[in-house]
């Protein structure tokens, strides 16, 4: 069985970002993204334009959630979809703590 080729997260983001008047949406649902990919994503400055981020149905764990919550570029994020990932109560706590600190997740 052949291994999947590595994901070029920057190319994927540039291909999938949908720019609108009020902000951008980024739909990365069901792309086999893991924690390493979310770590790369969380360091992309273009994320600061995103108001809606769909990361549902991937392979993201609490580690990826924490990387996303720690990103300096999520200040405009209003909607985050993480359905059907590998997130536990610990990941949910990271999200809740981000919300308490004034982030808009």
Question: Where on the chain are the PLM-derived regions?
Answer:
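Leucine-rich tandem repeat or coiled-coil scaffolds
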Residues: 1-105
